[in-house]
Swiss-Prot record:
Belongs to the pseudomonas-type ThrB family. GO terms for biological process: threonine biosynthetic process. This is Homoserine kinase. The keyword tRNA processing does not apply. Coiled coil: none annotated. The gene is thrB.
Length: 321
């Protein structure tokens, strides 16, 4: 979450008259994340999250995101729920941006996740994949192979400012993945961004998943690889196989991976590491000065990409074959 667009209190109060949420008591911006402008609101009825959708988010995608949260919640997944306006619409407008009110989810994200938490995340990810079955709206993954190349073209000229020699290395990686990427693995709705700050816990119990604004239709095992990258490396860059084993066991307790998915996991992990390297690289180079947003180091994901190149089997991630 982040803040790119400021809001005036009077405009916010007028916006809230379209909802049955009581009167505004206080509000503040939330700096974490990189995509939309987010605010924590306290009203006389309940705390809420206000999201203003910025230019990177296509307005035509918003029915998918908001509808998906409704669909998953109705099937028992703990996640935020968009609040309807008095006219029944889920989307309004504030400060020149499409805007929505979202229910507040209790919990905190973990700064130092342990293996037991990774097991819960794996289980919750599989539960989301199963709950997503039957969701009728479709959204292609804008940050898959074609999207990676487009991002790279915007950043390539300045890439060596981050590390010398990056241009040739990333060009070669893109070409390799384009030729080797699997096409026929099981697919469905994926979260595509299930990092620790998008998973809330109350104590050691997972209380819910948030931030579905990268969700799309893609390979389910690709979503697993994103979580391995996001949860199972230590601050020094080392892969923690105990966390990986726990996450994969948790996932497979709900939805067992097929043999083809298991064989493809190292390749998928290379792809997901490259995806987050490229978006971080773009944001690192292009984010405007003064934006209330937390930029993230792209080199973290370059090191993960290089790690996955050395992996010969999913067993090296902790998967029991």
């Amino acid at each position: 979450m982040a803040v790119y667009t400021d809001i005036a209190e009077d405009d916010l109060k007028w916006f809230l008259t379209e909802y049955d949420v009581g009167t505004l008591l206080s509000y503040k911006g939330i700096a974490e994340g990189v995509e939309n402008s987010n605010f924590l609101l306290h009203t006389s009825k309940a705390p809420l999250i206000l999201t203003l959708y910025e230019k990177r988010v296509e307005k035509s995608d918003l029915p998918f995101f908001l509808g998906l949260m409704q669909h998953l919640s109705a099937r028992g997944l703990s996640c935020p729920l968009p609040l309807p306006r008095r006219d029944g619409a889920l989307l309004g407008s504030l400060s020149g941006r499409p805007a929505a009110l979202i229910s507040f989810l209790e919990g905190m994200w973990l700064r130092k996740p342990e293996a037991k938490h990774c097991r819960e995340v794996g289980r919750a990810l599989a539960e989301m994949h199963v709950a997503g079955e039957g969701f009728e709206l479709k959204r292609p993954n804008a940050l898959s192979l074609d999207g990676w190349r487009g991002l790279w073209e915007k950043s390539e000229a300045r890439a060596d400012e981050v590390e010398s020699g990056l241009q040739g290395e990333i060009r070669n990686e893109l070409d390799f993945l384009a030729a080797a990427w699997p096409k026929s693995l099981p697919s469905g709705v994926i979260h595509a961004d299930l990092f620790p700050d998008n998973v809330f816990f109350l104590g050691d119990e997972l209380s819910g998943l948030i931030d579905f604004y990268f969700a799309c239709n893609d390979l389910l095992a690709y979503d697993v690889s994103i979580c391995l990258n996001a949860w199972c490396f230590e601050k020094d860059g080392a892969y923690n196989i105990t966390k990986g084993m726990a996450m994969l066991e948790g996932y497979q307790s709900v939805r067992p991976l097929s043999g083809e998915e298991i064989a493809a996991l190292p390749l998928l992990a290379r792809g997901s590491a490259l995806r987050f390297f490229l978006t971080r690289l773009y944001d690192w180079l292009m984010t405007p000065e003064g934006a209330m947003v937390t930029k993230k180091d792209p080199l973290e994901y370059l090191h993960k990409l290089r790690f996955h190149r050395q992996i010969g089997s999913a067993a090296e991630y902790g998967l029991s074959l």
